[in-house]
Amino acid sequence: MDARPGAEPDAPDPRGGPDRLRFAFRLVDGADEYGLVFSFARLGGAAGGGAEAHQAVWYVADRSARVHGGESWVDQGCVDAVRALVGADRVTDPRVRRALLDTLSQGRLPEPDRLLPRAARWREAPLDLDAGDVVLVRGDGHGGLLVEARGEESGFRLRLSPPGDGGRPREHVGTARASTDAAGAASPEAPVLEAPVLEAASLEAAGVLHFRGRSARVTGRGWHERAFGGDILPARDGRDASWSRARVRLDNGWELAVHRTGGADAPDGTPAACGATAVLSSPDGERVEAPATLRGLRPWTSLTTLNTYPTACDVEVPLLDLRLRTTAWFPRQEAVSVTAPSGRLEAHADAEGTMGGRPVRGHGLWEVFPDNRIEDFERHVTRIRAVTRQEIDRLYPAEPDARSLTELAGTEHRPERLDGAVLEDLHASLVGPVRHTTAGLGRSWRSYVSMAAIELFGVDSEPYRPLVAAAELLHTGSLIVDDVEDRSPLRRGRPAAHVVFGEAVAVNAGTAAYFALDRVLNRVLPDDAALRLRVYQVYLRVLRAGHGGQAIDIAGHRAAMDEAVETGDAEALLRRVRSGHWLKTAAPVRGLAEIGALVAGAREEQFRALGEYFDAVGLAYQISDDVMDLRGLTAPAEGGGRSATKHTAEDLRAGKVTMPLAHAVALLPPRRVRELWYAVRDGDADEATVAAAAASLEECGAVAACTGEARDLVERTWKPLRDLVPCTWASVMMGALGAYAARRERE
């Protein structure tokens, strides 16, 4: 392959397959600085067989405003290809897969994806790319390019040209691992497996950028590349398909691209130095390839995708005595599209370090593709645990902290009233029991709901991140108090707080945890008293419902079960069990979702539909919890795999009345119901008796009745909400959440 002078890219690979043209620029308008990443991709085509599919994507970063946004435009061929891949996928959790197929079957695309109004055109020699009049890329006849994007909310018109002798394009063929979406499709935004790449030198850009309602006349520099070949659907052989890449232009004229395959996803944020390959270009065009190390730093978890990305990296290239730290302008520069719903980081970044012992600075792009296929929805949701723990640590720090303790005690307006000794006592009594209980965080799905409800309405949840702590602390406080009232010695496999700290301390600390929301609202909604009032009203209703549910729990359902067994009428018993489940589980989940909707500015009809849906989700979750109890309840373990959280039929063994047992009253012969109930009623049945009772509940259809009820609850309430909210990846995941609540096991 011979590189041609000028900016225009090389011809396509005759092998066919994905073909991608990609640009990245740093642009300035006076003191304002922007980053632009733009890609035009063709997936398949005549050379590779099958119908052509096209996608045009761009993302803009506004450095001073710390805002990132963009658009993705696809043709019907791309939609059809994605639908086929999703339908054939057997790796992604079926609940997520069905939710995406449901969206696509309605002719809807999750934002930021949009359907091109007209067919795309891709012509070579001379280059002429047209994405339905939305995106145009053409040669200008003088070795440069004209690129234009006319989106609904953003766009640009730029002339790109070589900067002169120092900017001669130079070619090298690189190999990058495949980047695939959740359905297995190659991402047009990422290096393609075994894809030859023409890497152009720096390009100059001049033109107009439209973003967030304003236009800027910009100039700047950047680069383009063209990658082609590889497989759209790579083999799933268990290999880590993630990758990271830093591309930097230094102020001494050198350019650097360092690439690492694998190890890009680290949910715990632990940095590790990994082997990488660096390709450098000297100011006079000499190309140097050398071994390097790359260490990810400053982890940030996206509340949209729950990916954890390093937002900075340290690069070392010993051969050239180069040490460089590259840091993103700001963390939230994540890109998501229908061809890569797992998400990826495309962060414009600054770099500084030394080369040959001399200081150097630069700017460029830091990219991370974590390849997080959602193979297990529950494990995916559980990724929010790390964020939840961080936010809890801010409210309940491990060591006594005057500011947090005065807030906790309600004396922030007069902090001098609490001296050192008092602060020590407050920390031991109020913080200790809560941190003890949260050390074994569960699924944290309530925290997930609190953020997902905001995203559902197209609002960025990042400014409201502290709400995840309030959601979890509400649950934690109730667990601490419930364990005292139920005389439970264990919680999440650890001694309960009252066993360690005493009942009086535990009850007080658990109750105090309910007020975490007050502290959080003062931070995230400091200037909106009316909105805070509505949030408080919802939250106080949640607290009332929780105490009502615990009252029913303490009273128990034994007498109601006795009566149902004698009369053969299960309806009153079922209503009673459902009431307890609604008050203790559904009402809090509904309230947390409603708080998210209020924060997002949802309309009244949206607010009502969301409340009904989360009523159903919470009740379905507790019904499926009762079903899971019969089979042994597990949860994703932090170190991988799953760990048991309940023994098989633990509730049945304790003589508790659950939904399967209540449904069995109408499904088993009266004599068998009586035998089963009185065998477990007093909580002293042996293992064989409990196992036989659990088997009877499965065989008589009681479990099927529960799963059917849970499924119907969710399906009946999801469609009205779905039709009222924007079609986004948050809405796809919200549909999957309902399916998960109704059926917790992965099929």
Q: What is the meaning of each model-derived region?
A:
Residues 111, 503-516, 520-521:
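Aromatic-rich carbohydrate-recognition surfaces in CAZymes
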Residues 195-201, 212, 236-240, 505, ...:
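Short, contiguous, pocket-lining structural segments
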Residues 455, 480-500, 513, 518, ...:
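Acidic, Mg2+-coordinating active-site segments of isoprenoid diphosphate-utilizing enzymes
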Residues 1-184, 189, 193-375:
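Structured soluble/peripheral alpha/beta segments that form catalytic or ligand/cofactor-binding pockets
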Residues 521-540, 676-677:
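Transmembrane helix-loop-helix
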Residues 419-470, 516, 521, 574-617, ...:
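Alpha-helical phosphate/pyrophosphate-handling elements in metalloenzyme active cores
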